Amino acid sequence: MEGESTESTQNTKVSDSAYSNSCSNSQSQRSGSSKSMLSGSHSSGSSGYGGKPSIQTSSSDMAIKRNKEKSRKKKKAKCTQAQATISSSLEGAEEQPHSSGTTCDQKILHVLATTQQLGDQPSSLDHKLGEQLEARHNCGVGKAEQPQSFSLPCPLSVSTLMPGIGVCHGGNAPGGKWEKTFESCKLDTGPAKTERVKEDSFCCVISMHDGIVLYTTPSITDVLGFPRDMWLGRSFIDFVHTKDRATFASQITTGIPIAESRCSMPKDARSTFCVMLRQYRGLQTSGYGVIGRSVNYEPFRLGMSFREAPEEERSDNYMVANSSNMLLVICATPIKSSYRVPEEIHSQRSPKFAIRHTAAGIISHVDSAAVSALGYLPQDLMGRSIMDLYHHDDLPVIKEIYESVMKKGQTAGASFCSKPYRFLIQNGCYILLETEWSSFVNPWSRKLEFVVGHHRVFQGPKICNVFETPPNSEPKIAEELQNKNTRIKEEIVNLLAEKVSRPSDTVKQEVSRRCQALASFMETLMDEVSRADLKLELPHENELTVSERDSVMLGEISPHHDYYDSKSSIETPPSYNQLNYNENLLRFFNSKPVTAPVEVDPPKVGSSDVSSTREDARSTLSPLNGFEGSGASGSSGHLTSGSNIHMSSATNTSNAGTGTGTVTGTGTIIATSGTGTVTCASGNMDANTSAAFNIAANTSAADNFGADTSAADTSGADTSAADNYAVDNYGPGNFGAENSCADNSGAENSCADNSGVDNSRPGNSGADNSAADNFGADNSGPDNSGADNSGPDNTGPDNSGAENSRAENSRADNSRPDHPRPDISGASNSRPDKTGPDKSGAENSASGSGSGTSGNEGPSSGGQDTRTTAGTPDSPPVSLTESLLNKHNDEMEKFMLKKHRESRGDRRTVEKNKNKTTNTIDSLKILEYSSTGPGHGTKRGGSYSWEGEGNKPKQQPTLNSVGVGTGAPEAPIPPVHPTHTTHTAIAQSSFSAQQSLFPTFYYIPATPLAASTPAPGALSPTPRNQKHHHHAHQHAPKVPDQASTSQQAAGPAAIPLQYVTGVMYPHPSLFYTHPAAAAATAMMYQPMPFPGIANAMQLPEQPSTSQSNYSKTVFSVIVAPPTITTTTATTTPKTQGAFHSITPAQLQRPSSQDTSVKTEPASNATPSHSSNKKKANSSIASGIGDYNSNQACSRNRANVKKYTDSNGNSDDMDGSSFSSFYSSFIKTTDGSESPPDNDKEAKHRKLKNITRLSSKIMEHPEEDQTQHGDG
């Protein structure tokens, strides 16, 4: 090995080929050679391949200094050995391992022998080997050079070209030598050619990490002339022509992403492209000249594929990295000219190649098959104008061809063949082409996009080697001809830029064909799409209120799949249209009631307060003003007179006498907040109210009757009517008619309320009633309220007289399932007896809705016990129409959905409370009788039902104590100033919304001349004079003319009860019927606030003036500790229209009324168990005892607040959406249910409840039961 290495070194020095080869480490070390210097690589032997230092650096320098003579002698001496080595190397180059020193020597000898053959005479070879070896050797060398003659560029020496190509011969070697070599090769082409096919291409492996060549096949020496080891460790791109490096790089970047999928790409998948590779500039090709020689490039077609490098190391030559890496495998095949002889004629079977250019003539695509025919690589032609490649003499023909192209372009896919024309190739010659032309026209713009020519060579060039460098000189063309050619080229380009016209017949055919296709498609489409698929599926009607996405609230998942299930009926209120109030409304319309009384001369009233003029009454009557907080202006006298103007009943001012007010029509008396205000007539109510007020005073007289009333009277369906009052209640006669009027109606109302949990809820009298003074003792008329209010009377068909018919009265009660009787539908009405028209009358007096005469008994202290009845037969028919009702239904449906979502969070307590139904009812009763503190006298009425007993009203004892505790004794009220307090309809259900569900409502005044309408939003019932409301067992201080509200008395303990004369439903009442509406059968909608959320609920106050207009008190009831401020408000008169939309903002209490009470969860009055569950942290958390008139007065009377729900959304919406006129027809679930509160607060409230129990005095609890239950 060492000897061979030394010999190799010597050969290298002698050859003076500027190459030093060493076999040590199987690496070819390269010294500074002329090739290296010219190629720009400048890599010396010190660089070494594979990072190994060269051991031949010093000898390399010496080798350059060797003289040529000595080297020639050495070569001659070694000629025989070299020749033998060459033959063996040529035959078995692929098989021999290149790691041995012998192989290196053989390669070196091969180079030397080739050089000697090229430079010396053939006689030297003949002398050593013989003619046969020489012929064989010459043949091999000739075949090795022959393929290069067609592929080498023009700069190659002429000696490498075939003779007869048409180029001059010359060069360093004698021509005879080459001719002989060529001829000898031709004689032996058969076997030699087969052998050379294997050597026609080479492969190399390149690392994608750094682009270094890791492996090459031995055939690279035959193809490019490089020794095999020359490329190892070199960058492949160094051997690529500069102009082709961008193409090579682009192919690499596009191929890498594909290769990274690795297994997904087939093994044989390749990308092919053409580049020029540098040839070896050894002595074999370039002779001995080193300086001044050009670098020659040869075209190759490269097939590129990616592989994953193997993990293990192979032979030293493999040079594979230890770590896994991507490898690029390139197989290079030389591209040779397709022409053998000059100007040869090709047959029709010659291959075609395609060139595509745009309308501007710019070439956009060239087939790789065109390289051998044109000599251009695809990247050489891309971006050039094809017009430059046409022969200038053929441009007119080319123009005709393109005109034909434009014509054929009218038909998609049309093609044609043109006459032959000349085309310029790379070596500067022209070839004759036959082309099949086609084009593509944009169907939208109708412009030519590109032209494709499929070319076939008809005649070859004069110079067969198409890769030869073209001559520098260009043919000279006359300037005139050049201008002409330029003009023709421009015309061609302009022609291609024009729009392609289409024949009209073609257009028509295409349109017809497309129309037919469209019609066929539509028929198929219609067959596929059936009508059933187009059906719009709407949810079931009762699903409208139960949205699945709304079922998840407050962490509770309660999808209501069975909406008729008993449980879901508790948690999910029925659809608005499912409520049975529609039936009652229809019955109301069928009864053809007269609810809008005609203006009549006011009856003479015996009260000084009635002295006000009719004009004053009219001015104060405006329903808008009355219902807004600002409406009712004027004194109580105005109210009284205004109400009396249209009252057909006499006002009984006698304290003892029983003034019988004849109730013409149905004067529904809804006693509110125990003021005993009898709203017999719409609008007259105020007068009644004032009467009621008087009653208040009377009530105190009635105190006596208080117990009685609540006792039997109330219980007695009829009794509770006027009877009770007349007899028991008014036994004392204090209340006389009034009591019966106001009280009764009050009591009654409250009765209904009180007795009917629901009733009370619907809240005519609501808790109020019960709380109300009326209910104080008067309330005792649960009966009263019971029977009367809801009294069939009120509702009673008779009552329905005008007022009875009132949807409200009759409806409210009637609708209540409890009161099976339609007439009785009134909560109190539910009592069959009440249905009697007369009773109704009596009750009307009592309940204010009776059409009969009401015995106005009782001293009306300070006022007229005015028993005013409105609704004379002269009045025009009601303006409520079914169309209006339908519209209302739709709006109510939407609003109920909204409120239902807001209140759903409170329904979770239903199940818990269900088990506590009895206890809850008892606790409610206890609350009604709370005797300590100012807050007592809360009366709860209304039907209290569960799934099983949804239509059965629960019986409840009436509060005999007047709930009008004087929380603020400092604020006295003039005795004759009856303050009309609206019943606060606080839902006892689990509804959490603290504002009225329907904040706005319409009021159709029955008597347009009524002085003023009460602001139904006012929650604080005005007590009658304390002496009247105070029972013996009530401990509230008796302050005459005290303007304390019933909520003052019952504030903390009051459970918001809503009283509406109507049927009880198993879910909380959603609507509140205003007393005025009940009295005059006018449509009035009162917002009903629902407690249960910490937000303070600003309850509107009722102007005192409006109270005097209606001799009916609405009992303000508070459902629980939820924070509710109830006040009695006085407002200025404001003219109102027939339809008046009242919003909670309008009901805001002005500061003029000092009787505002704040309820606190922990107040003295103990709420029921359900009420204990109310939010303890109410925004208004001040005790009733802390209240004083200054607090009430401190409020800015202009500070009008709208009801807002728990989310702060205002309920001040369209008035039509909030009609509570139908509140009495809404089913209600158990009224005592309220959202659960923290256990701590609940326990605290229970303690208070127990305290209330001990102090409560129930006089006739059995008589206080809801009369609906009896009926």
UniProtKB/Swiss-Prot annotation:
Bias kind Basic and acidic residues: ranges: 805-822, 831-841, 885-896, 903-913, 1257-1271
Main location: nucleus
Residue ranges of every copy of the PAS domain listed in the record: 189-259, 339-409
Pfam families recorded: PAS (PF00989), PAS_11 (PF14598)
Disulfide bonds: none
GO biological process, one term: negative regulation of transcription by RNA polymerase II
Spans of repeat Sequence: 657-658, 659-660, 661-662, 663-664, 665-666, 667-668, 674-675, 676-677
Entries under InterPro entries matching the protein: PAS (IPR000014), PAS-like_dom_sf (IPR035965), PAS_fold (IPR013767), Period_circadian_regulator (IPR050760)
Subcellular location: Nucleus; Cytoplasm, Perinuclear region
Region called 8 X 2 AA approximate tandem repeats of G-T, residue ranges: 657-677
Record's protein name: Period circadian protein
Organism listed in the record: Drosophila pseudoobscura pseudoobscura (Fruit fly)
Upper taxonomic lineage: Eukaryota, Metazoa, Ecdysozoa, Arthropoda, Hexapoda
